[in-house]
Structure formats: structure tokens, C-alpha cells
């Protein structure tokens, strides 16, 4: 605890206000960069961070309701995985490469399939940030403006995992509909 004492500034150390102006390598950072010229730094930071927090809370509530209805032994793990992936891909304000470890533990608890593949893909893409994207855009001198970097880095990093997540969601929906259709046909024949 003593090692953290120099960083403690009272209860506001834990508040969201301190973090609402920190944006990097994420979709909210790209939104921040796009809105900055029209709204100004303070208002843009406040609005983007508030929208991200509200979206995260709504998604978590929806996933909690899904897990409550499902009641299988994997429902909590699945909902937790979906929430952490939603947060990292869509609403995380300040993304760092090591955050990609978070979903791996949950994916390991789920049956082989889309979750494990998404977690692995996300890990590879996150590792590409310092190995590919940063040299491509951040090694130039003078350094491009922060707004220019954020408009490109977040969407470039998150595009492939988001596309995969959407494809997995559509695939799951199609499979469920086919299964329900077969069950309905089987019940009608009986």
C-alpha cells in the first residue's frame, strides 16, 4: 500500500472523471478524435466516456438477463466473456495490448468454438499494435497529431475481431434457427 501512496489523491483517484479524458487505440478514441473539432476537448471527453459507460452497463445488464434465463452451468462464464469482449472491442477508452489476456481465461472455460477463436484472434491483433501498427504510423517524425493517430489506430486494431464477432453471432443465430426449425418439424411429424 505504501508504494501507491504517492499516487493517491483522495477518493477522486477512483472516480471516472480522472479517466474520462484518457483515450488511446480504441473505438471511443476514434469517436473522440472525430468529435473533437466540433465539440471541444472537455465536452467531447465527457460525452464519449459517458456513452461508453452507459453502453457497457446496458450490455452487461442484457448479458446478465441472458445468463439468468439460460441457467446452464456455462451461462455465467459465457456472459462474462461476452461482456469483457464487448468492453474491449467497443467501449474501452484506453486500450493497451496486455488487456488481450483478460478474455483468454474465460474462453478457456468455454467449449471449443467461436469464443476461443475470438479470444485468440483478439490476442494476435493486440500484439500487432506494437509490432505492425505503431511502426507504420508512429515512427514518423514529426509524430502525426493525436487526432490523426486515434482516427486510424483504434478502428484498425478492432476491425478484424469485430468482424469475426459479428460473423460468429450471425452463425450462432442461423444455427439456432435451423435447430428450432428441425425441432418444430420433428414435433409436427410425431
Where are these regions (language model features)?
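Transmembrane helical bundles and short interhelical boundary loops of multi-pass, membrane-embedded
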Residues: 1-87, 91-94, 110-177, 189
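Generic transmembrane alpha-helix motif of multi-pass integral membrane proteins
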Residues: 101-110
Amino acid at each position: 500500500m505504501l508504494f501507491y501512496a504517492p499516487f493517491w489523491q483522495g477518493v477522486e483517484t477512483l472516480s471516472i472523471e480522472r479517466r474520462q479524458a484518457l483515450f488511446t487505440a480504441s473505438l471511443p478514441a476514434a469517436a473522440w478524435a472525430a468529435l473533437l473539432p466540433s465539440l471541444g476537448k472537455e465536452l467531447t471527453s465527457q460525452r464519449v466516456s459517458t456513452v461508453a459507460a452507459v453502453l457497457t452497463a446496458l450490455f452487461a445488464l442484457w448479458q446478465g438477463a441472458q445468463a439468468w434465463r439460460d441457467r446452464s452451468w456455462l451461462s455465467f462464464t459465457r456472459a462474462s466473456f461476452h461482456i469483457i469482449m464487448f468492453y474491449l472491442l467497443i467501449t474501452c477508452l484506453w486500450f493497451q495490448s496486455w488487456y488481450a489476456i483478460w478474455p483468454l481465461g474465460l474462453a478457456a472455460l468455454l467449449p471449443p468454438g467461436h469464443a476461443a477463436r475470438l479470444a485468440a484472434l483478439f490476442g494476435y491483433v493486440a500484439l500487432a499494435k506494437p509490432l505492425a501498427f505503431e511502426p507504420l504510423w508512429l515512427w514518423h517524425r514529426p509524430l502525426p497529431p493525436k487526432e490523426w493517430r486515434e482516427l486510424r489506430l483504434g478502428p484498425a486494431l478492432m476491425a478484424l475481431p469485430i468482424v469475426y464477432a459479428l460473423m460468429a453471432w450471425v452463425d450462432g443465430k442461423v444455427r439456432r434457427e435451423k435447430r428450432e426449425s428441425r425441432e418444430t418439424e420433428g414435433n409436427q411429424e410425431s
